[in-house]
Regions:
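Membrane-proximal helix-turn-helix segments that form the acceptor-binding/catalytic region
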Residues: 89, 124-142, 149
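Active-site proximal beta-strand in glycosyltransferases
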Residues: 99-127, 140-143
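Conserved donor-binding/catalytic core segment of Leloir-type glycosyltransferases
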Residues: 175-193, 199-203
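Nucleotide-activated donor-binding/catalytic signature segment of Leloir-type glycosyltransferases, i.e.
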Residues: 224-243
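Aromatic "clamp/platform" in nucleotide-sugar-dependent glycosyltransferases that forms part
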Residues: 260
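Short hydrophobic beta-strand element within catalytic cores of glycosyltransferases
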Residues: 277-280
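Conserved acidic donor-binding segment of nucleotide-sugar-dependent glycosyltransferases
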Residues: 291-292, 296-303, 312-317
Length: 355
């Protein structure tokens, strides 16, 4: 089978949607299928997109990557929709796709096709919601990636099935508790990830006598560098490789994520794959991080509350071990090959052999 994976916007965004596409694409190839990725555009002067995509997402297999356009500095919603409507179906047919799995719903004249609803919808206008509702009606199946997504899309589309996010578990090598450093890891440097909340929470822990440091992993951020320049207990690791990020995360005592919006809980899943207890905000779906089972949940953005949650993990070895073990067991359901098999079962239902 030849599967086309669609990214509505830019394939070079370093976000959860492209991580989803990367992991699912590799899993399909491991299962013996042909795969290509088609996106609207890419950012910057990136040669050999397939090789770049493989490296940045920590894949073992290179996947073909094509775009409708060349480099674009920003995602232009109306232009994207027009391009997908006029060019998308033709491109899929040219590349002999048997099915399209579309991430970021678009008007594409091709069948059969599956839409994957990712969210969040917090910044979507009333007009855009109406457009989304119409677009989803043109798809053969709609998949939600979590119960939170299913709830969020209620009123726009009814999800036919819930299939979890694909995660490449072999990339994570958890360290034993006694080998771990006194590190707290925060992932994400954009303002929505609230890294300064994490910085203040760790500062409070240090004021209480805990000898811990904070490592912030994410894209390069000048504003964040200015804000924390005087805080010697914080290390910024901008634009690190997947291998280095996972190595740090798997050696930490905890991961903290006081996010205001979390469409893709990949940071939480990666922490769990490391056996590193995540301390997360209300923005992370509660079917991913279960309080006191696979992590700790905080219902505010107050640094004191995050400091208190982190302190529980630092002081209570029994709680830390309980979450560590449960997280490692729970995350197995996100194995990218098993997730790909769920998609293939759905595709088999849709594409019935002709006699």
């Amino acid at each position: 089978m030849r599967i086309g994976l669609i990214r509505r916007g830019s394939i070079t965004h370093l976000d959860g949607v492209n991580r989803f596409i990367a992991n699912l694409a590799e899993a399909f190839k491991l299962l013996g299928h042909e795969v290509f990725i088609l996106s609207w555009s890419h950012r910057g002067d990136v040669e050999e997109l397939g090789r770049w995509f493989k490296t940045v997402h920590g894949l073992d297999i290179e996947v073909e990557v094509f775009t409708l356009r060349g480099p674009e500095d920003k995602d232009r919603w109306l232009t994207m929709l027009f391009d997908w409507f006029t060019k998308g179906g033709e491109m899929l047919k040219r590349f002999d796709a048997d099915i399209a799995i579309v991430n970021g719903v678009v008007p594409i004249r091709f069948k059969p096709k599956i839409a994957v609803a990712h969210g969040p919808l917090v910044s979507v206008s009333r007009l855009q919601r109406s457009v989304l509702k119409l677009l989803y009606r043109t798809y053969d199946r709609v998949i939600c990636v979590s119960e939170e997504t299913r709830r969020e899309y209620k009123g726009i589309v009814k999800c036919d099935r819930l299939i979890p996010l694909p995660l490449k578990l072999k990339n994570f090598k958890p360290l034993e508790p006694f080998k771990r450093a006194n590190l707290i890891v925060h992932i994400g440097t954009r303002p929505v990830k609230n890294p300064l909340v994490s910085a203040r929470a760790v500062e409070i822990l240090r004021e209480r006598g805990h000898d811990v440091e904070l490592v912030v992993i994410g894209g390069r951020s000048e504003w964040l560098e200015r804000e924390i320049a005087s805080k010697k207990f914080i290390r910024l690791l901008p634009d690190v490789s997947e291998e280095e990020k996972n190595k740090v995360l798997c050696s930490a005592k905890a991961m903290v994520l006081p996010s205001s919006g979390e469409a893709f809980p990949y940071a939480s899943l990666e922490a769990m794959a490391c056996g590193t207890p995540p301390v997360v905000s209300y923005a992370v779906p509660d079917d991913v991080v279960v309080h006191e089972h696979t992590g700790l949940r905080v219902e505010t953005l107050n640094p004191i509350d995050y400091a208190n949650a982190l302190e529980r993990l630092l002081k209570d070895d029994e709680l830390w071990t309980h979450i560590h073990r449960n997280a490692l067991m729970y995350v197995k359901r996100f194995d990218h090959v098993e997730v790909a098999k769920e998609y293939l079962r759905l595709i088999k239902e849709m594409i019935k052999p002709t006699r």
